[in-house]
């Protein structure tokens, strides 16, 4: 599929039934849902999309923002004539969903799934639920600089943080994750980091237009605070499911439980 600005957008479409639309995280791609698509597609129609600049989508570095990515997601939904979609976003994928709500409300959606993500990445005196519970604007800008100066070192630090207690399960998994992540151009990585840092969606939470399933890891290194419980309080139609043996990636760390919960929620 081609987006409205000419950038090719890669998607997959498998199974039949009520649609589930899986959106990956920062620098990742649809392959990260390899433990979920086969099982979920037994009972649902499962769609994935590689966000522009990621995976097999176009790398033109044109309009590399989450707002445009949300428009791309809407275009995929329209292209496939989907309705009553359960849209699930992991990490940055949840940020994309916030932009979707801002642009389109709950149009074409039945529900949403937030997977271990914050409405505001940066911490300050009044907010401790951002990245690591400590990342401030100075650190956010420093990370953008480091992405350009020594990207591999950044990847080697961030990838283990995606697992429980900040410890990757094995070297082979880390190598695969880094290899797939490095397919995203460095300029794209930096652009989407800036796009995430620039937005604060806390005020939108009480106006969330659809029911939300909150999937949060009890042992998340990226979000070590009680973020899931906080969002459960602020989002009117929400349900919190805590993954006791997961960090930032419950769909990978506890796939059977994740698949069961998201299938139940999607109906």
Q: What are these language model-derived features?
A:
Residues 186-233:
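Conserved serine/cysteine hydrolase catalytic core
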Residues 98-103, 108-146:
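Flexible "cap/lid" loop of the alpha/beta hydrolase fold
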Residues 1-21, 42-45, 82-83, 110, ...:
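Alpha/beta-hydrolase fold catalytic core
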Residues 124-130, 145-206:
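Conserved alpha/beta-hydrolase catalytic His-Asp/Glu region
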Residues 34-38, 47-92, 101-103, 260:
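Active-site loop/oxyanion-hole signature of alpha/beta-hydrolase fold enzymes
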Residues 27, 51-55, 94, 119, ...:
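Alpha/beta-hydrolase active-site loop signature
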Residues 238-267:
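Catalytic active-site module of serine/aspartate enzymes centered on a nucleophile-bearing elbow/loop
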Residues 7-62:
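Conserved HGGG/HGGXW glycine-rich cap/lid loop of the alpha/beta-hydrolase fold
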């Amino acid at each position: 599929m081609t987006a409205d600005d000419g950038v090719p957008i890669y998607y997959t479409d498998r199974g039949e039934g009520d649609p589930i639309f899986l959106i990956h995280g920062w620098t990742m791609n649809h392959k990260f849902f390899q433990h979920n698509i086969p099982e979920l597609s037994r009972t649902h129609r499962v769609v994935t999309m590689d966000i522009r600049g990621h995976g097999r989508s176009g790398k033109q570095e044109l309009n590399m923002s989450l707002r445009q990515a949300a428009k791309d997601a809407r275009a995929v939904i329209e292209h496939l004539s989907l309705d009553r979609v359960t849209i699930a976003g992991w990490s940055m994928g949840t940020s994309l969903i916030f932009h979707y709500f801002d642009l389109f409300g709950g149009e074409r959606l039945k529900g949403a799934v937030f997977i271990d993500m914050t409405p505001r990445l940066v911490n300050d005196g009044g907010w401790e639920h951002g990245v690591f519970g400590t990342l401030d604007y100075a650190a956010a800008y420093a990370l953008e600089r480091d992405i350009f100066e020594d990207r591999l070192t950044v990847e080697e630090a961030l990838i283990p943080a995606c697992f429980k207690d900040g410890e990757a399960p094995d070297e082979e998994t880390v190598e695969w994750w880094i290899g797939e992540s490095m397919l995203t151009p460095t300029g794209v990585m930096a652009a989407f980091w800036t796009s995430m840092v620039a937005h604060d969606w806390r005020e939108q939470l009480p106006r969330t237009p659809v029911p939300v399933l909150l999937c949060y890891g009890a042992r998340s290194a990226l979000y070590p605070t009680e973020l899931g419980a906080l969002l459960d309080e602020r989002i009117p139609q929400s349900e919190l499911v805590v993954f006791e043996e997961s960090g930032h990636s419950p769909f990978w760390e506890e796939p059977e439980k994740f698949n069961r919960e998201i299938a139940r929620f999607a109906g």
